[in-house]
Structure formats: structure tokens, C-alpha cells
Amino acid sequence: ARHIRKTISIVGERIHHELNGVSCIGIEEVKNKKNIISSKSFGRKVMLVSELEEAVSNYVVRACEKLRAQGSRAQGLYVFLRTSPFVDPEKRYSNGMSTFFSIPTSNTSKIVKEAKHLTRKLFVYGYEYQKIGVMLLDITDAENEQYSFYEYENYDQSDRVMEVLDGVNSRYGSSTLTLGAQGIKKDWRMKSERKSAAYTTNMLQIPVVK
């Protein structure tokens, strides 16, 4: 061990001990995120509020998947949108709004509804929008929360629905089951013609040997 320390360092010596069954490297637990952001620039300029609502719904879905994956619920939501910062000053617009839920939630449908409401309030006609995004705020651990009987029943039913949704999408590929608010065409997205196939997350894209 001393020879290892001289030639590699004390870190190398610790690794040597670990490989020989002597625990000397502490395990640090990965903490859950307190805020979760989901956002991406559009593939083209967007001027319709309906397309902004569709985009924000998709970003909420992704954020909620991450939220439930770490066993958490969000107490609030922040939505922001903006034009390109490089256009003429009179054509620039950037704004954001937040809202807080009466009780913490991880229900995608509920958060999508609030996100669309905030998007409509933020939207100003005439601008060419380049980006919209969401942030889930004040995230809490679902296991540590206390509920009334009424709240528990609602949570139980909501959790079962979300569990089925996540289970199907995890097994058969992302977006196998989607909300109507997410739209179908989604031509506001970044162009993905050069995007690699999702071999590890979408069964339909697994190559077939003939």
C-alpha cells in the first residue's frame, strides 16, 4: 500500500484498499433537484399562441417525468418565453410568470393546464418567438408529505394514472402515450433529420437483422 501511495497518490491507495474489500471511500448520496427546467429553442419562429401552448405542454411533460423519477412533487411553476435577443430592439420581447399550487403535485395534466394558462397571459401578438420553457419550483419529497384523507385519495388516484403513463412510455418508448395538448405535427421543434435513432429508449427504432 505504501508503494502504491508513493507511485500513484493517496487516492490510488484508497482505491487499492477498496478493491481488496477495505471500505475507505465514503458514499455520497445524490440529492434530488430543487428545481427542474425544461426548455429548447424552436426550429423556426413561432407567432401563434396555440403553437406556444403545444410547445410548453411538451416541456411540462418532460419536466414531470424527471420530477416523478426522483419521487418528488412541485409546489410551483414558472413559464418564460422570449424572442431572439439578436433582432432589432423594437422586435424583442422577454417575460415570465409563476404560479403556486394549493398542494404539491406531480400530475402532468394539472401542471400542463397551469402552464397553458400562464402562456396565454404572457403572449403578446405580433412577436416572433424563439424559445419557451418551464421550471418546476420548490420541489419536495413525496414520501415526507402529510395529507388529509381527501388529499390522500386524490394523490393515490393521480399517482396510479401517472405510474401507468410512465410505465408504458418507459417500456415502449418515449411519447408512446401522450396528452392531446402536446399536439401531433409539432413542426415548431428543432429539425431532427440528423438525429441518431433512439435505440435504447424506443423499441420501434431497434435495428432489425434480416
PLM region descriptions:
Residues 1-126:
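DNA-contacting surface of Y-family translesion DNA polymerases
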Residues 101-210:
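Acidic, metal-coordinating catalytic segment for phosphate/diphosphate chemistry
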